[in-house]
Amino acid sequence: MKIYLASGNVNKKREVQELLPSHTIVLPKDEGIEFDPEETGSTFFENAMIKAKALYHIVKAPVLADDSGLCVDFLNGAPGIHSARYGSIEGEHVSAEAGINKVLSELKGVKDRSARFACCMVCLLDENRFYSVQETCEGHITEAPSGSGGFGYDPIFFVEKFGKTFAELTSEQKNSISHRGRALFSISRFIKGS
């Protein structure tokens, strides 16, 4: 099945394609579609649904949308839904390095570095059928970035199970425990049953 991914992020596309290998995952920009809806929701679910509905109205085909982010306990859940824009002045996307540096500076000298990645994923098959799931992956924030894999905050997100940051894991290891991997596993069962 051809599934449109409501994103412009090629790294997300790669992860989704790895986890849904029997489907063809397409970004809007792959087909020349301009897509950048305003994420005005106050939760991961609301933002995922905004993206899913906006893209579905354009393509009239199955759409997968996620909204995910890093939630740090000491920062009261920040960056949260603002992870891609954390530290920006006018709400624009910031580089991964800028987001990482902001989180690390805010946690300087802090002992409680517990955090989680959260992902809410929505699969919209048609105007009447959708499925949503929210998953998390627990970990903590390191003192400094480590590893070159992954993307976003992966170099500072340490998971006990492997004793490494997400950026130090193979894609298979990361997908087996990540927030997005867990959500996609649930979504794949929904798609198969539909």
Swiss-Prot record:
SUPFAM superfamilies tied to this protein: ITPase-like
Enzyme class: hydrolase
Example of a GO biological process term: purine nucleoside triphosphate catabolic process
Reactions that this protein is recorded to catalyse: XTP + H2O = XMP + diphosphate + H(+); dITP + H2O = dIMP + diphosphate + H(+); ITP + H2O = IMP + diphosphate + H(+)
Keyword Magnesium assigned: yes
Listed GO MF terms: dITP diphosphatase activity; ITP diphosphatase activity; metal ion binding; nucleotide binding; ribonucleoside triphosphate phosphatase activity; XTP diphosphatase activity
Cofactor remark: Binds 1 Mg(2+) ion per subunit.
InterPro entries: dITP/XTP_pyrophosphatase, ITPase-like_fam, RdgB/HAM1
The organism's place on the tree of life at top rank: Bacteria
EC number(s) from the headed UniProt entry: 3.6.1.66
Residues engaged in binding substrate: S7, G8, N9, V10, N11, K12, S68, F151, G152, Y153, D154, K174, H179, R180
Metal-binding is among the record's keywords: yes
Pfam families cross-referenced by the UniProt entry: Ham1p_like (PF01725)
Reported cofactor(s): Mg(2+)
Binding positions for Mg(2+) per the UniProt entry: E38, D67
Keyword annotations: Hydrolase, Magnesium, Metal-binding, Nucleotide metabolism, Nucleotide-binding
Cellular component terms per the entry's GO annotation: cytosol
Record-annotated active site: D67 (proton acceptor)
NCBIfam families per the UniProt record, alphabetical: RdgB/HAM1 family non-canonical purine NTP pyrophosphatase (TIGR00042)
Subunit structure, as described in the record: Homodimer.
Role of this protein: Pyrophosphatase that catalyzes the hydrolysis of nucleoside triphosphates to their monophosphate derivatives, with a high preference for the non-canonical purine nucleotides XTP (xanthosine triphosphate), dITP (deoxyinosine triphosphate) and ITP. Seems to function as a house-cleaning enzyme that removes non-canonical purine nucleotides from the nucleotide pool, thus preventing their incorporation into DNA/RNA and avoiding chromosomal lesions.
Family membership noted in the UniProt record: Belongs to the HAM1 NTPase family.
Name the record gives this protein: dITP/XTP pyrophosphatase
